[in-house]
From Swiss-Prot:
Coiled coil: none annotated. The lineage of its organism: Bacteria, Pseudomonadati, Pseudomonadota, Gammaproteobacteria, Pseudomonadales. Gene3D superfamilies: Vaccinia Virus protein VP39. Keywords: Methyltransferase, S-adenosyl-L-methionine, Transferase, Ubiquinone biosynthesis. O-methyltransferase that catalyzes the 2 O-methylation steps in the ubiquinone biosynthetic pathway. This is Ubiquinone biosynthesis O-methyltransferase. S-adenosyl-L-methionine binds at residues 36, 55, 76, 120. One of its GO terms (molecular function) is 3-demethylubiquinol 3-O-methyltransferase activity.
Length: 232
């Protein structure tokens, strides 16, 4: 059985044409992208690295990593977001290879092929996040690093990520997230270790509604990223 939630795919298919509109529903992704790319780049030095972006969507992160000098492959199961990503790279002149394939299927095809694997804002949209994490482990080379980001599962996260972001501030369309699919750092860490990865670092991402700015912080109550390593 494929680890794909077709309702989740349909949700992003419907919005795909606005993926690169910085004032659209995807504004938060555009706003946090520089923070995330810098954090990753500081840890792996993307230039010259072979990178896989799992759940790449319309290519916001994929393009940014390619601009840092990485050779990037982006995979997603959404046909419309991938079409948008392909079109946008013609405009931007950035070269990314995009494929419509699951992480699990690509792991069969390309084990231990990537220096870096990123899987950001994707785990909370699949039926079995641990399956994706295992696939990421299989695809990264020994000594390589895997980065995940998702949303914590607690009352504060519900208040900020769903009530605040979707209903009050309208940063995201209603129904973007399902609270039951949010993932605690302890769960993500445990799944990573079970897959064979070593957790190296964790950082939170906070939003100030007054300044409308995001920043990296020690607070992992809502959005957070983790850095993991496949030991050699």
């Amino acid at each position: 059985m494929s680890n794909v939630d077709h309702a989740e795919i349909a949700k992003f298919e419907a919005l795909a044409h606005r993926w690169w509109d910085r004032e659209s529903e995807f504004k938060p992704l555009h706003d946090i992208n520089p923070l995330r790319v810098n954090w990753i780049d500081e840890r792996v030095n993307l230039a010259g690295k072979k990178v896989l972006d799992v759940g790449c969507g319309g290519g916001i992160l994929s393009e940014a990593m390619a601009q840092r000098g990485a050779t990037v492959t982006g995979i997603d199961m959404g046909e419309a977001p991938l079409a948008v990503a392909q079109l946008h790279q013609l405009e931007s002149g950035v070269n990314v290879e995009y494929r419509q394939i699951t992480a699990e299927a690509l792991a069969e095809e390309m084990p231990e092929q990537f220096d870096v694997v990123t899987c950001l804002e994707m785990l909370e949209h699949v039926p079995d996040p641990s399956s994706v994490i295992r696939a990421c482990f299989r695809m990264v080379k020994p000594g390589g690093q895997v980065f995940f980001s998702t949303i914590n599962r607690n009352p504060k996260a519900y208040l900020f990520a769903i009530v605040g972001a979707e209903y009050i501030m309208k940063l995201l369309p209603r129904g973007t997230h399902d609270f039951k699919k949010f993932i605690r750092p302890s769960e993500l860490g445990a799944w990573s270790r079970m897959a064979g990865l070593t957790v190296k670092d964790i950082i939170g991402l906070t939003y100030n509604p007054l300044t409308k700015h995001y920043k990296l912080a020690a607070d992992v109550d809502v959005n957070y990223m983790i850095q993991t390593l496949r030991e050699e």
